[in-house]
UniProtKB/Swiss-Prot annotation:
Oligomer and partners: Heterohexadecamer of 8 large chains and 8 small chains; disulfide-linked. The disulfide link is formed within the large subunit homodimers.
Cofactor(s) demanded: Mg(2+)
Gene label: rbcL
Function in brief: RuBisCO catalyzes two reactions: the carboxylation of D-ribulose 1,5-bisphosphate, the primary event in carbon dioxide fixation, as well as the oxidative fragmentation of the pentose substrate in the photorespiration process. Both reactions occur simultaneously and in competition at the same active site.
Name of the protein: Ribulose bisphosphate carboxylase large chain
Organism placement in taxonomy: Eukaryota, Viridiplantae, Streptophyta, Embryophyta, Tracheophyta
Organism: Castanea sativa
PANTHER family: RIBULOSE BISPHOSPHATE CARBOXYLASE, RIBULOSE BISPHOSPHATE CARBOXYLASE LARGE CHAIN
């Protein structure tokens, strides 16, 4: 080796491992309006300082690797690196910290949720220096959100398409979720829609199985929709699940739904993937279809409070990728959902501008700059006695979805739908008259049951049903 080369190597490059915090922990950094900001809940391994753990997250989710490399000198590390700019302890938790990381916008491909997640969470969660890691929230800058189409249509366009205003929409998941023939499935759809529901729904794992192929299901459901519309004078829909093994097959199913003239299709966005979901959302906007999103598999990712990704992040990602509805918990039913946290991500789905509010788990102010909103769907173990609370909690811009709470009615599917519609109309009227749904809800339902035998029967069946378990995910 020549003396010149030896000198250059010794001065400009030093092989080996170095502390991440020397490069990636920058507490004096002033965040930019164009930065993507992330809040991570970090649990370091014993002996790892929180500053080093936060810096490691910033490094491994941006430009860093485990050692200094020659090619570091061929780019501007200062321009492209992620920066851990603030760390704070988590109240009431030992050895847990919130690490705030800023990412330069140039690290991300425009209009790609897939690339965003691959960068931010794709590799760092297996890092040895961390015992556990959870992505609690993201701030999406307006300069990045404007590169996304977002929901195919949004809340106002959906209401205009359906000609339904001033109340939540009502839905029902057809049960049993698996095993029905296409004709019997279509019959259940018709009975529920005829009874007063706005939508019925394929369950998330109804795709194209031997007992009911997708094309047969689509045909019988379309027949049910048109028959119910003719008899009620209302626009009806059924969430036809287009999720498939390939993107090409998924689009083929959406095309067939459009040819049938139905208003809405459905996708399982986490199991199907963000690339497939964005492709379907673009097709739906171009062809006038609404898009219902199911969050199957979400609890695998978001349920543990110290590891994974919080659902508010998955909800933001869905609004960017595209969907007109998404399941969002209930607060009162059988599935997970703590009230303030749930209302926090419901606002992130629906509103244009959401202020930072740590009491609801919102770590950053989020400006969606008129990206269309998403209707939250409440489903899972809910029935007529829950109607006042659901109406108060979720408001008009929501879908309230009763599966067993419709089909479990002792008189059949149509009376179950009637009971839910009567309960909803009674709650909306009482609210509009200034009554307190939280305090007077049960009395409102009892009053309506006096003139609706279907509701009276439903009230009797579900008066003792409760799901009394504490929420796992609390602040």
């Amino acid at each position: 080796m020549s003396p010149q080369t030896e000198t250059k190597a010794s001065v400009g490059f030093k092989a080996g491992v170095k502390d991440y915090k020397l490069t990636y922990y920058t507490p004096d950094y002033q965040t930019k309006d164009t930065d993507i900001l992330a809040a991570f809940r970090v649990t370091p391994q014993p002996g790892v300082p929180p500053e080093e753990a936060g810096a490691a997250v910033a490094a491994e989710s941006s430009t860093g690797t485990w050692r200094t490399v020659w090619t570091d000198g061929l780019t501007s590390l200062d321009r492209y690196k992620g920066r851990c700019y603030h760390i704070e302890p988590v109240a009431g938790e030992e050895n847990q910290f919130i690490a705030y990381v800023a990412y330069p916008l140039d690290l991300f491909e425009e209009g790609s949720v897939t690339n965003m997640f691959t960068s931010i969470v794709g590799n760092v969660f297996g890092f040895k220096a961390l015992r556990a890691l959870r992505l609690e929230d993201l701030r999406i800058p307006t300069s990045y959100s404007k590169t996304f189409q977002g929901p195919p249509h949004g809340i106002q366009v959906e209401r205009d398409k359906l000609n339904k205003y001033g109340r939540p929409l009502l839905g029902c998941t057809i049960k049993p979720k698996l095993g029905l023939s296409a004709k019997n499935y279509g019959r259940a759809v018709y009975e529920c829609l005829r009874g007063g529901l706005d939508f019925t729904k394929d369950d998330e794992n109804v795709n194209s199985q031997p007992f009911m192929r997708w094309r047969d299901r689509f045909l019988f459901c379309a027949e049910a929709i048109y028959k119910a519309q003719a008899e009620t004078g209302e626009i009806k829909g059924h969430y036809l699940n287009a999720t498939a093994g390939t993107c090409e097959e998924m689009i083929k199913r959406a095309v067939f739904a459009r040819e049938l003239g139905v208003p809405i299709v459905m996708h399982d966005y986490l199991t199907g993937g963000f690339t497939a979901n964005t492709s379907l959302a673009h097709y739906c906007r171009d062809n006038g279809l609404l898009l219902h999103i199911h969050r199957a598999m979400h609890a695998v990712i978001d349920r543990q409070k110290n590891h994974g990704i919080h659902f508010r992040v998955l909800a933001k990602a869905l609004r960017m990728s595209g969907g007109d509805h998404i399941h969002a918990g209930t607060v009162v039913g059988k599935l997970e959902g703590e009230r303030e946290i749930t209302l926090g991500f419901v606002d992130l789905l629906r509103d244009d501008y959401i202020e930072k509010d740590r009491s609801r788990g919102i770590y950053f102010t989020q400006d969606w700059v008129s990206l269309p909103g998403v209707l939250p769907v409440a489903s899972g173990g809910i029935h007529v006695w829950h109607m006042p609370a659901l109406t108060e909690i979720f408001g008009d811009d929501s879908v309230l979805q009763f599966g067993g709470g419709t089909l479990g009615h002792p008189w059949g599917n149509a009376p179950g739908a009637v009971a839910n519609r009567v309960a909803l109309e009674a709650c909306v009227q009482a609210r509009n008259e200034g009554r307190d749904l939280a305090r007077e809800g049960n009395e409102i339902i009892r009053e309506a049951a006096k003139w609706s035998p279907e509701l009276a029967a439903a009230c009797e069946v579900w008066k003792e049903i409760k799901f009394e378990f504490p929420a796992m995910d609390t602040l």
